[in-house]
Regions:
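Conserved PLP-enzyme active-site core in the AAT-like
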Residues: 26, 36-45, 58, 65-68, ...
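Generic beta-strand/beta-sheet core signal
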Residues: 216, 241, 262, 303-304, ...
Length: 715
């Protein structure tokens, strides 16, 4: 970080010559000097060059207005104002909070001023670095010799082997040197929450508006289990979102709890809706407790916020209404909601404490902020027994954490602190909205078909758009007003084939075909439904990537309309079965899969499959214990009616459990089986379109088997 920008428009010798001297002095201190053309060019430079560590400008020309604009982007960035002896320094005490240093134009003062700028730059870096990351950088620079773990010793061991050297060269020396042992006492301990690790947790809690925050190094799958193990002791009852992540199913397999499921909605597109407000009411919960064997009043509730498709709840309503001691918002996909006013009242840590309740929010820092994979956080608002909570934390945390993951978690928080973080999130929101509008524009200008966007008719206001009962764009029935909101950065594109009310069109392009084309062109889709594709506009998405996606979508339309051969348009798919796809063209492939979906009446089937839950014969914990005792057998998928499932069955998409361990598909819930059979049939007819179904195993003959409990194990 060594770039200094000079707005050099002084225009007279007595100003320009001191700046030339300063330029040379700064270069001797290894600074890189850049000259923006004007004020707007400077602001663009600050926006696009994060390594800029200072701005030099003429006070008479630019004054406080420029300083305030820069502060809105980065309030910590050092500013150096040059003035002559007669300049008026009309600066208030409030203005002095800006990071401004004043210098006078003078010949022969360049060395002293350059040294002052170097000192201020060092202070700037020290200010923006969070505590653990700062301590880790310091330790690596010191280059101590260690006789402890890890065995590669800062990368030395890798360089003693040809293949190890290739590995070392790829990742680089700092990655190796920062992979250190918990024996390094000056960095404290992740498990003991001591030293710089404790400071990092306190820092993160302040940034995320939490009472207490924990860094988790094995993803939000683990964070969810930590919260659940503490909040729901054996023998208790919990309320849990039926559209929960599979990690929460694993929690219920590990902990002997009785689940009562919240039942979310779903529209014709297969987009997961929210849990209706009625599900949170005391009377509804009391009825479910009465209907559920061995259930008691729930002690804990788990809600997925946002949903996989970007729908956020009015969390204030849930916190106030839900009559349980603790509420866990699984917010893996929205770690950014604390940093824009449009998310106020729509996230777990929003607002203050709730009397008599503990609010948890788990977030996948790595998913949509800037952190290494597996980086996750737990935020807590309310009173917990920290010693007991830490037992659950240690139960799921390695004693050899990777400090790179930990430091990246803290750095992600540091990036979101203050105005710089707000600017990052606002940039994502603006790019997503521009992309949405561009898709709409291209749709109106295209000949024939083009993609559409799942969103309100008018998106002129930057906000989370409400789903209202008097609107039809969302496709949900009986929606509660002021309850669910669409996050603008979660962009769902619609392909032809289905109307929002579930009516199937004669012409259709299943989204899986588009996803395969995009993958051929280096673009990975987050989630694919029957006729929809989800794209996430995270802070890492820039204009270039957004334009690349637009280009790929228009290229797909052009290739599709030309009706190219599959082997030319989708070569990876062609390689799955060259004989089958040899003479097939893209329109034939799309229309045949579309007809198969129409044949099964997908909208109605999907609705019925998720409307009636399978019967819970035993808890997921009890079913898993029987599996551990070997009391299971495999049967064909077609034969699972009337049998107790041993494992969860979870098709991708949408990636939520369809059948839980311990549940039985009955005649009433047969649509669940029919939905799974339809997914399998598409894969059987068209190689390369097999659906990934967790808990169902494809055999050599192409049929699927599932694991069920043996008949005698029902006793």
């Amino acid at each position: 970080m060594n770039v200094i920008a000079i707005l050099n428009h002084m225009g007279v010798y007595f100003k320009e010559e001191p700046i030339r001297e300063l330029h040379r002095a700064l270069e001797r201190l290894n600074f890189q000097i850049v000259y923006p053309n004007d004020r707007d060019d400077l602001l663009k430079m600050i926006e696009n060059n994060a390594r800029l560590c200072g701005v030099i400008f003429d006070w008479d020309k630019y004054n406080l207005e420029l300083c305030e604009e820069i502060s809105k982007m980065n309030e910590n960035l050092p500013l150096y104002a040059f003035a002559n002896t007669y300049s008026t320094l009309d600066v208030s005490l409030n203005d002095l909070r800006l990071q401004i240093s004043f210098f006078e134009y003078a010949l022969g003062a360049a060395e002293d001023i350059a040294n002052k700028i170097k000192q201020t730059t060092d202070e700037y870096i020290n200010t923006i670095l969070p505590p653990l990351t700062k301590a880790l950088f310091k330790y690596v620079r010191e280059g101590k010799y260690t006789f402890c773990t890890p065995g590669h010793m800062g990368g030395t061991a890798f360089q003693k082997s040809p293949v190890g050297s290739l590995f070392y060269d790829f990742f680089g020396p700092n990655t190796m040197k920062s992979d250190i042992s918990i024996s390094v006492s000056e960095l404290g301990s992740l498990l003991d929450h001591s030293g710089p690790h404790k400071e990092a947790e306190q820092y993160i809690a302040r940034v995320f508006n939490a009472d207490r925050s924990y860094m988790v190094t094995n993803g939000t799958s683990t964070a969810n289990k930590i919260v659940g193990m503490y909040s729901a002791p054996a023998g208790s009852t919990i309320l849990i979102d039926r559209n929960c992540h599979k990690s929460l199913t694993h929690l219920m397999m590990m902990s002997d709890v009785t689940p009562i499921y919240f039942r979310p909605t779903r529209n014709a597109y297969g987009i997961l809706g929210g849990i209706p407000q009625s599900e949170f009411q005391h009377a509804t919960i009391a009825k479910r407790v009465k209907e559920t064997p061995n259930a008691t009043w729930p002690v804990h509730a788990v809600i997925t916020n946002s949903t996989y498709d970007g729908l956020l709840y009015n969390t204030d309503f849930i916190k106030k209404t839900l009559d349980v001691k603790s509420i866990h918002f699984d917010s893996a996909w929205v770690p950014y909601t604390n940093f824009s006013p449009i998310y106020e009242g729509k996230c777990g840590m929003s607002g203050g404490r709730v009397e008599g309740k503990v609010i948890y929010e788990t977030q996948s820092t790595h998913k949509l902020l800037a952190a290494f994979s597996q980086a996750s956080m737990i935020h807590v608002k309310g009173d917990v027994n920290e010693e007991t909570f830490n037992e659950a934390y240690m139960m799921h945390t390695t004693t050899s954490p990777h400090y790179g993951i930990v430091a990246s978690t803290e750095t992600a928080a540091a990036m979101m602190k203050g105005n710089a973080g707000k600017r990052l999130i606002n940039g994502s929101i603006e790019r997503a909205i521009k992309f949405r509008k561009e898709i709409k524009r291209l749709r109106t200008e295209s000949d024939g078909w083009f993609f559409d966007v799942w969103q309100p008719d008018h998106i002129d206001t930057t906000e989370c758009w409400p789903l209202r009962s008097d609107s039809t764009w969302h496709g949900f029935k009986n929606i509660d007003n002021e309850h669910m909101y669409l996050d603008p950065i979660k962009v769902t594109l619609l392909t032809p084939g289905m109307e929002k009310d579930g009516t199937m069109s004669d012409f259709g392009i299943p989204a899986s075909i588009v996803a395969k084309y995009l993958d051929e062109h280096g673009i990975v889709v987050e989630k694919t439904g029957p006729y929809n594709l989800l794209f996430l506009f995270s802070i890492g998405i820039d204009k270039t990537k957004a334009l690349s996606l637009l280009r790929a979508l228009t290229d797909f339309k052009r290739a599709f309309d030309l009706n190219l051969r599959v082997k030319n348009m989708l070569p990876s798919l062609y390689r799955e079965d060259p004989e089958f796809y040899e003479n097939m063209r893209i329109q034939e492939l799309a229309q045949n899969i579309h007809k198969l979906i129409v044949h099964h009446n997908l909208p109605d089937l999907m609705y019925r499959a998720f409307e009636v839950l399978p019967t819970m014969v035993m808890t997921p914990y009890a079913a898993f214990q029987k599996e551990l005792h070997g009391m299971t057998e495999e049967v064909y998928l077609d034969e699972m009616v009337g049998r107790i499932n041993a494992n969860m069955i979870l098709p991708y998409p949408p990636g939520v459990p369809l059948v839980m361990p311990g549940e039985m598909i009955t005649e009433e819930s047969r649509p669940v089986l029919e939905f799974l059979q339809m997914l399998c049939e598409i894969g059987a007819h068209y190689p390369g379109f097999e659906t990934d179904i967790h808990g169902a195993y494809r055999q050599a003959d192409g049929r699927y088997t599932v694991k069920v409990l043996k008949e005698e194990s029902k006793k």
